[in-house]
A protein has these predicted regions:
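Conserved short alpha-helical segments that host acidic/polar catalytic motifs at enzyme active sites
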Residues: 1-208, 214-275, 280, 369
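A conserved beta-strand->alpha-helix junction
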Residues: 121-129, 134, 299-312, 405-413, ...
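Phosphate/diphosphate-binding loops
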Residues: 195, 202, 207-211, 260, ...
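Secondary-structure transition/capping motifs at alpha-helix termini
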Residues: 268-274, 293-300, 334-338, 360-369
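Long, K/E/R/D-enriched contiguous segments that form extended
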Residues: 274-311
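Short, glycine/charge-rich flexible loops or terminal/linker lids adjacent to PRPP-binding catalytic cores
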Residues: 296-341, 380-392
Length: 471
């Protein structure tokens, strides 16, 4: 995944840029960078590896030595960026968020026009560099950005820093957000809407799907109007988005309360009577509060996340490291576990590894029962549109492994759709088998129709591909 932030100022933008980028640290833990432009000294750029140290620690020096009236920066979980490019458009810096599924095909086309690339350490091309090369195929930034949006299969949002202003372009189907902020001496563009609030900016507006704007210290100009079709990622509300953020006017925190509330309504007729409701911190917390408020069952924190040093556990490259982080960052409160029946809400079940270990950890700490309520439907399809996971195969999903076991072979699309239907016999068999394998006392997933209701916008505007396979 990843996130970005850009700012302009009549004075120096680096303070705002530094903290605006830092507020995206929940979206990645591998690379981070900042690029600035000053009318007197030109461009400056810094990129650091943040796998073993947070953004603020790595960029403290740059926050004091870099200067500029405009700048962009990013947290990236894949490639090093922003990159600095010199072309017929002049010198510019670019940062992107998205996923390019047809990179090899595009690469051949671009190379045929005499472009060349530097390989990354793993032998692959930097996707942001590829986007820059696509843009350079056209006569100006507007045509270049539109060309990139047109030919990229997957998703693509970007910020481009030039001497005249910052271009902000949202993905053509709005799969990821870009929101603008305004204060007296400039503007900003941000992936997360909360990232600029403590910096003195006020909400200005969100970009629509495919919309392109350019802004400087004085104004924001629309260059390409937004399209009518949107497919924003629903998983942003479920997990990735920070609780204080909002997308399309819908609060992440409130949406998670709604999820918990609707989960509790589905449980009312079941013979499940836990002593307390808890959430797997941090993303499961709001879901659990919503459940507790609706059900009347007390909310508790049977384990506490040690936040000062442990990052999100999906980020490290190796599964063993992810599992270690998942274990080490949660500290038990035995008085709230021993002899208790617990209902635990997590944002999702992907591989099943971490939640199974959490469940065993609770049993080992004296829990009588552990009822699991994921806050989204079963994940049946790998995401085609965003770099949400390091998974290289859909068979890493626990659902797909269980379905193959039940079917005796790899299922076709129509069979998977049967398993996606929460009212089908196949769906219930899959859920029962997952419950058995994971040693849960009971398991009930959030239904897709309830999830869509939890968000509260037009269902046609939501991407739900990872749950139902519908593009």
């Amino acid at each position: 995944m990843g996130g970005f932030f850009g700012a302009t100022s009549r004075e120096d933008c680096v303070f705002d840029l530094f903290f605006g980028v830092d507020y995206h640290s929940h979206l990645g833990t591998r690379r981070a960078g900042m690029a600035v432009y000053d009318p007197e000294t030109g461009f400056d750029k810094a990129i650091h590896n943040i796998e073993n140290a947070p953004f603020r620690t790595k960029f403290t020096s740059e926050s004091q030595t870099m200067h500029g009236t405009m700048g962009i920066g990013c947290i990236s979980d894949y490639e090093a960026q922003p990159i600095l490019v010199r072309s017929q458009h002049g010198t510019f810096a670019i940062t992107t968020v998205g996923k390019i599924n047809n990179a090899d095909e595009i690469l051949k086309t671009v190379i045929s026009h005499n472009a060349h690339f530097f390989e990354m350490q793993n032998g692959e091309i930097n996707p942001t560099e590829l986007v820059a090369a696509i843009i350079n195929q056209k006569d100006n930034f507007i045509d270049g950005i539109r060309f990139a949006q047109e030919i990229v299969e997957g998703s693509l949002s970007m910020l481009i820093l030039t001497p005249k202003g910052i271009y902000a372009a949202r993905d053509k189907l709005g799969r990821t957000p870009i929101v603008l902020g305004k204060k007296s001496d400039g503007f900003c563009a941000s992936f997360e809407s909360f990232a600029y609030l403590n910096l003195g900016y006020q909400d200005y507006r969100e970009l629509g799907p495919g919309e392109i704007v350019v802004f400087d210290t004085e104004s924001v100009r629309m260059l390409v109007a937004p399209g009518k079709k949107m497919k924003i990622c629903t998983f942003l509300w479920v997990y990735y988005g920070y609780p204080s953020s909002s997308y399309e006017g819908i609060s992440v925190e409130q949406m998670r309360y709604n999820c918990g509330r609707l989960l509790a309504k589905r449980d009312k007729d079941d013979d499940v009577h836990p002593d307390t409701v808890a959430g797997v911190p941090d993303s499961g917390t709001a879901h659990a509060i919503g459940y507790a408020n609706e059900s009347g069952i007390p909310y508790s924190r049977p384990f506490i996340k040690y936040t000062p040093t442990w990052p999100r556990s999906f980020m490290p490259t190796h599964q063993s490291k992810r599992d270690l982080i998942a274990k080490m960052k949660l500290i038990p409160v035995h008085d709230l576990i021993d002899g208790k029946s617990l209902l635990l809400i997590d944002d999702s079940i992907v591989r099943g590894t971490q939640l199974r270990e959490t469940t065993e950890f609770l049993y080992a700490s004296g829990a009588k029962e552990v009822h699991i309520r994921p806050a989204c439907p079963p994940l049946l399809f790998g995401c085609k549109y965003l770099n949400f996971s390091r998974s290289t195969s859909e068979m890493e999903l626990i659902t797909r492994r269980v379905i193959r076991e039940l079917e005796g072979c790899d299922p076709d699309y129509d069979t998977l759709c049967e398993y996606a239907n929460p009212d089908s016999e196949k769906y219930q068999k899959m859920v029962d088998r997952i419950c058995e394998l994971q040693h849960f006392t009971s398991l009930r997933y959030h239904r897709l129709d309830d999830l869509i209701e939890s968000v509260g916008i037009d269902p046609e505007c939501l991407c739900t591909y990872c749950w139902d396979g519908k593009e």
